[in-house]
Amino acid sequence: MSWDDGSHAKVKKVQLTFDEIIYSIQVTYDGATALQSQLRGSVGPKSAEFTLAPDEYITALSAYGKSLSTQEVITALTFTTNKTSYGPYGTKSGFQISAPEATGKQISGFLGTSGNVLNTIDVHYSPIPTGGTGTGGTGTGTGTGTGTGTGTGTGTGTGTGTGTGTGGTGTGTGTGTGGTGTGTGTGGTGTGTGTGTGTGTGTGTGTGTGTGGTGTGTGTGGTGTGTGTGTGTGTGTGGTGTGTGTGTGSGAQKLEAQGNSTGGTSWDDGSDYDGVTKIYASYGGEGIQYVKFDYVKGGVTKQGVLHGKQQSRQNPREFVINHPDEYLVSVEGWYETVMLGIQFKTNLNTYEVSIYPFEPSTDTKFTLQVQDKKIIGFHGFAGNHVNSIGAYFVPKSSTTPVPSTPLKLTAEGGETGAVWDDGSHDDVKKVYVGQGQDGVAAVKFEYKNGSQVVFGDERGTRTLLGFEEFELESDEYITSVEGYYEKNFGVDTVVTTLIFKTSKNKTAGPFGIVSGTKFEFKKEGYKITGFHGRAGEYVNAIGAYLAPSGTTPLTPATQSQKLEGAGSEAGTLWDDGAFDGVRKVSVGQAQDGIGAVSFVYDKAGQVVEGKEHGKPTLLGFEEFELDYPSEYITAVDGTYDAIFGNEPIVNMLRFTTNKRVSIPFGIGAGTAFEFKKDGQKIVGFHGRAGDLLHKFGVHVAPITK
């Protein structure tokens, strides 16, 4: 059932019931009297409510929704105000929809559809109330003189020079009903000499006599093409002056907007940039709903303005352009009354957003491109959709820059799920892939920055099948990732398969079922250094960061050395990496040997807690804590042995520091080993483990004062 609360003075209170989806919403509004809407939906198992302060307004709404077999449902809601945010309520799954913040606007009402649950939701915007305003009085005065009149509030006017005639609108405080102002009037417009940019028509402000402010004086020259100092004179009535200037232009070539330029409002981002760094776009409804661009100037990122309209049902896309190594060379698109599809082409990639493929019989196609030039800015027309688009071009650099920043490759797969981004690191250390019934359910990655290990978050929702995993050696890196994605019945588009290839000609995978559309992330001479994508109940899309395989680490590593471990090859490989030092050792014993170990390290004065390796038993852990930083481990000795014909396990460990020796953890039996190197201290550990500790090794680094 459709419903519409209408628009009100402001939202006062919001009440929700929910579980994994939103069951109902009920809103109380402020007005002449408080008005409570009907319950939209039905009562769910969980409830929440919040009340806004008198000077607090809802400025944005973020929602998630999904399509079930019989209906669409809202799964999560987050409300943002001018002071804080409330939520999320429900579970973030499915596609994201939003009512974004609009300058000077508040969300003053809601509308949507509901039955037993909340199916859809949209909003009404209205201006945020301000203090009393009005038009200042019209005064009689000279130039910047004062005027008296009757008006409400505060008026603003500017004027320069003197003249006799009708004064400008005043700014200030005066007498009169509602606040008649005395202040600065709008001065005359006259004929004068001005400084301008390029060649154009200028407005002169000066001294004059007459009604409407015509006079003679000094004015500002016109704005034209190029930058320079313009000198000229002009005579104008009602604000028109003519100026002539000379100067050197910026060199940007403006190609006219292509599309339907009769609809929407003109917009122009200008051309005072070095390049484009990010593209935002969305499709839905009749075509491309909006575009937005981020630019860079002198190394500083400048965020552009959204052109078009964000709507409740949208399919947002974001494309990162890795300036200065990557730059836009052309734009292709097709349209009817509004833009239906746009392709942004760089020297490295093609990024596309479209609602329909190009249809020659009905659509008009265009290309914006200039030989040996790149795009540094955009302009066009837009209303509820993007009507047309044009571009500014400048010559490409005569030299090709050496890649200095990682390349971010666009995620492949579906458009639903929440955006996630691990960023770029020195290397990938470990990969976890969890499978589900319809595809890859979850992924998780560990990275290395210098000697520090960075643990990425779990992306997606793991199933009872858990994770499959593989760990790279210290001198090994991922050279390519292959995969497949497809849309299954009743399920959003998901990644179905992942395959990882390394610098040592190893292949991990395929993880999942090979089915659907194939993709690959690979570039000669580059390695994979990070991942990003979209995920909800499944991994909907995945992308990668690439960096030259000889890239200098983001964080210089300690001058450490990895000593080969002692024990067997059973279990799973683990490696904590190298740190500044060890703060605490924890050893858990089992019936037949060492069950598990974990360590606490120090990195630049920060405590770093390592993971447990192995499987703890009911015996728990014994601990050996160091007096860090004055105390450090200089040696580790132990033994390993095969029990009842099984793979050997580590059955004893003992730690020696520059001050003392720990107790032996376990019972020594079998083959003895020791890790020790003159002038070095132990700064990290590695090995192999399953239900027991099968192998143990160390990282060492020079002892420093």
Curated annotation (Swiss-Prot):
It comes from the Eukaryota. GO terms for molecular function: carbohydrate binding; copper ion binding. Keywords: Lectin, Repeat. Residues 131-250 have a biased composition (Gly residues). It holds the Pfam family Jacalin. The keyword Repeat applies. InterPro entries: Jacalin-like_lectin_dom, Jacalin-like_lectin_dom_plant, Jacalin-like_lectin_dom_sf. Residues 128-271 are annotated as: Disordered. One of its GO terms (cellular component) is cytosol. Residues 1-127, 252-395, 406-548, 560-702 form the Jacalin-type lectin domain. PROSITE patterns: JACALIN_LECTIN. Belongs to the jacalin lectin family. Component of the PYK10 complex, at least composed of PYK10/BGLU23, BGLU21, BGLU22, JAL22, JAL23, PBP1/JAL30, PBP2/JAL31, JAL32, JAL33, JAL34, JAL35, GLL22 and GLL23. PANTHER family: JACALIN-RELATED LECTIN 3, JACALIN-RELATED LECTIN 34-RELATED. This is Jacalin-related lectin 34.
